[in-house]
Amino acid sequence: MRYDGNIQQIYNPPTPAGLITVINNYLGTPVAERWFRRGERYKALAYEFYQRGLYPEACFFAQQAAEFLLNGRLIEATGSRPYTHSIYHLVKMLFEALGAELEEGVARCAKYLTEQYIGSRYPDARMLDYDRWDAEQCIKCLEEVWRSVEKTLS
């Protein structure tokens, strides 16, 4: 693809559905399925780190689990995924693609998880260290987003 000067082309490059088909054929496992599997592993890691008292890691993997689930569902629904780490934007795009209404609680949780992308990765990104309450909120929000997505698809 040739760059035409449109900055959006860099941040949200087109991913034609045909490319997903080529990748599926090459990898042997559907791309969406690969996103789901990794999302499930990250969800398990979020719980594991929470149980071990590793709260920043629990929040990091909760955010990642939601991101991977949503990317997989977007690929499944539309044939592509946007280039963003915003759980809020991903869930909003998915619900729009499905013609479903995004509940306020899910939107709030998606925004909360989005904030964890930077805060949980870098020790100097937050004023306060992560604690048990933070990790519980991350896990609750992951469960809320996950449950809402699966309910909407069923």
Language-model regions: role of each:
Residues 2-154:
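Terminal alpha-helical segments
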